[in-house]
Amino acid sequence: MSRYRGPRFKKIRRLGALPGLTSKRPRAGSDLRNQSRPGKKSQYRIRLEEKQKLRFHYGLTERQLLKYVRIARKAKGSTGQVLLQLLEMRLDNILFRLGMASTIPQARQLVNHRHILVNGRTVDIPSYRCKPRDIISARDEQKSRTLIQNYLDSSTNEELPKHLTFHTLQYKGLVNQIIDRKWVGLKINELLVVEYYSRQT
């Protein structure tokens, strides 16, 4: 299944706020209208919607998300929390959380078009897994810096998560540590996502 490129508002109206996909928010009351439909949601539907929320927020294909779930299952610790850490430490998401892009799709474009350096080297893979002490910066070119400055100017000035530091004048961010669960930028029940995939295999 390919990455979603359809109407974004349609998704947030059904699933709730997806800041990685779009800065738009569902209108007040739209969630209530969805909940007022006759019939109770099945457990499968609830798990499916949490999975879709995760997939659309981080801009993943179904295959990519399944791959991350499998990696998380093999790691030590809570599968759900490890899954969120893997997704949050992707380069495209780090750029988004730093404010260097307004959405994750915009961050992905910056990476694909070779505007971003990691530790002084160009990285053009959005899924690149960042690690503590990585330095994320814009290429020292006018075009790269202008693009990022435009995103910074339009950002909503949300509080920077504790695992990141950003130096605005240098267009440079630092990964301080692996993200803590409470700083994940999406309202999600990751256990339902893990349960969804457990029942599919």
UniProtKB/Swiss-Prot annotation:
Entries under InterPro entries matching the protein: Ribosomal_uS4 (IPR022801), Ribosomal_uS4_bac-type (IPR005709), Ribosomal_uS4_CS (IPR018079), Ribosomal_uS4_N (IPR001912), S4_RNA-bd (IPR002942), S4_RNA-bd_sf (IPR036986)
GO BP terms: ribosomal small subunit biogenesis; translation
Membrane-crossing residue ranges in chain numbering: none
Predominant localisation class: plastid
Gene Ontology molecular functions: rRNA binding; structural constituent of ribosome
Domain S4 RNA-binding: from-to ranges: 89-169
GO cellular component, one term: small ribosomal subunit
Subcellular location: Plastid, Chloroplast
Region (Disordered): 14-43
Superkingdom of origin organism: Eukaryota
UniProt entry keywords in alphabetical sequence: Chloroplast, Plastid, Ribonucleoprotein, Ribosomal protein, RNA-binding, rRNA-binding
Quaternary assembly: Part of the 30S ribosomal subunit. Contacts protein S5. The interaction surface between S4 and S5 is involved in control of translational fidelity.
Recorded family membership: Belongs to the universal ribosomal protein uS4 family.
Alphabetized PANTHER family for the sequence: 30S 40S RIBOSOMAL PROTEIN (PTHR11831), SMALL RIBOSOMAL SUBUNIT PROTEIN US4M (PTHR11831:SF4)
Protein's job: One of the primary rRNA binding proteins, it binds directly to 16S rRNA where it nucleates assembly of the body of the 30S subunit. With S5 and S12 plays an important role in translational accuracy.
Annotated protein name in UniProt: Small ribosomal subunit protein uS4c
Gene: rps4
